[in-house]
């Protein structure tokens, strides 16, 4: 029997929350109030994120909060309060943290509110919003804390996911983003086909020739592999596919609709590849600039660009970020589990 759409979102949220909670409780040296509050906040942020993939929820949010600017800022104010409260819980509240959190949440919302009158294409306002969401985390401009504090995930990643989905779906009303989380047959089909093509013809040949991948000798227990895949899907695949396929590729394709779709796919894949320029996986080529030496992970950039091409194909074929996010999790999971000694 097919799971009803809303039931799927509830079951998925609850399942992620239970799994994440059990893992953290089993690994904790002691169960503190801070840990329990952190887990509750994690569950809340996962639930709101997953709920916004339900078209009925999106429609209700648009009717409730999408009619005037003050109403539109109410959910973001909720995220801001959660952020401040969590920083207080960790004794990590600073004036700069408050200011950067405020700017991170409200500037994209204001820009996208005034961008609603324009066509759903790449404009300077939504480009600025995308860069703020991306670079504030990439450059550690927002507080670098985890949830839970010990052994958790980046707190602002969950804040970013909620805010970017809310800003573009509810405020900007970008209905072409393709934010859907319930998989169908096409999602699995394209994910598996492109996974096989990428690994067989690109990842393994290029990876071994360049020394980027090595057969691991320290195997993790097999039961951990599905958990690794789920973690990568939620905290790497989903955010990166939202950003690079659902927003950057999508808006560029709309902006340059008279340009070959393959060129847009190529261009967005190159952007995706160079977004990994700060990764620390050898081999490197060293660039000397302003008296400093910068290691450039050239093999990583090449393979990421090629992978980005296949992620983009999955996005184009399905019209959803889900297929590329699944494919992304499969690719990274394959690398992490089987070929990454680190």
Model-derived features with residue positions:
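Alpha-helical transmembrane segments in multi-pass membrane proteins
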Residues: 33-41, 69-170
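Canonical alpha-helical transmembrane segments
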Residues: 44-66, 84-85, 107-115, 241
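Alpha-helical transmembrane segments
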Residues: 5-22, 40-45, 68-83, 126-134, ...
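Juxtamembrane helix-loop-helix connectors linking adjacent transmembrane helices
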Residues: 99-101, 120-124, 140-237, 289-292
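Membrane-interface helix-boundary motifs at transmembrane edges
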Residues: 55-69, 112-124, 147, 178-186, ...
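Juxtamembrane "helix-exit" motif on the non-cytosolic side of transmembrane helices
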Residues: 20-30, 53-56, 81-92, 135-147, ...
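Transmembrane helix-loop-helix hairpins at the membrane interface
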Residues: 198-342
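N-terminal topogenic module of multi-pass integral membrane proteins
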Residues: 1-61, 324
């Amino acid at each position: 029997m097919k799971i009803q759409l809303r039931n799927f979102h509830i079951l998925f949220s609850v399942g992620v929350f239970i799994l994440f909670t059990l893992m953290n409780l089993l690994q904790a040296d002691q169960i503190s109030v801070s840990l329990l509050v952190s887990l509750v906040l994690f569950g809340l942020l996962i639930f709101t994120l997953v709920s916004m993939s339900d078209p009925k929820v999106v429609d209700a949010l648009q009717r409730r909060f999408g009619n005037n600017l003050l109403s539109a800022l109410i959910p973001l104010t909720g995220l801001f309060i959660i952020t401040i409260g969590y920083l207080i819980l960790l004794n990590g509240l600073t004036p700069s943290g408050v200011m950067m959190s405020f700017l991170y949440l409200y500037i994209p919302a204001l820009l996208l509110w005034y961008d609603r009158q324009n066509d759903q294409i790449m404009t300077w306002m939504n480009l600025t919003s995308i860069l703020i969401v991306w670079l504030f985390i990439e450059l550690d401009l927002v507080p670098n804390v985890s949830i839970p504090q010990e052994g958790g995930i980046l707190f602002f990643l969950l804040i970013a996911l909620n805010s970017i989905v809310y800003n573009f779906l509810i405020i900007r009303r970008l209905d072409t983003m393709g934010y859907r989380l319930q998989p169908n047959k096409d999602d699995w089909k394209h994910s598996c086909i492109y996974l096989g093509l990428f690994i067989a013809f690109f990842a393994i040949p290029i990876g071994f020739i360049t020394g980027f991948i090595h057969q691991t000798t320290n195997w993790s227990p097999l039961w951990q592999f599905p958990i690794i895949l789920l973690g990568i899907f939620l905290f790497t695949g989903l955010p990166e596919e939202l950003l690079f396929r659902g927003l950057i590729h999508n808006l560029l394709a709309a902006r340059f609709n008279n340009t070959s779709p393959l060129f847009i796919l190529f261009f967005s894949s190159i952007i995706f590849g160079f977004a990994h320029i700060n990764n620390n996986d050898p081999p490197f080529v060293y660039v000397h600039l302003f008296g400093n030496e910068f290691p450039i992970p050239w093999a990583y950039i090449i393979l990421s660009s090629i992978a980005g091409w296949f992620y983009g194909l999955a996005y184009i074929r399905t019209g959803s970020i889900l297929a590329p996010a699944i494919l992304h999790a499969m690719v990274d999971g394959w690398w992490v589990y089987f070929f990454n000694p680190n």
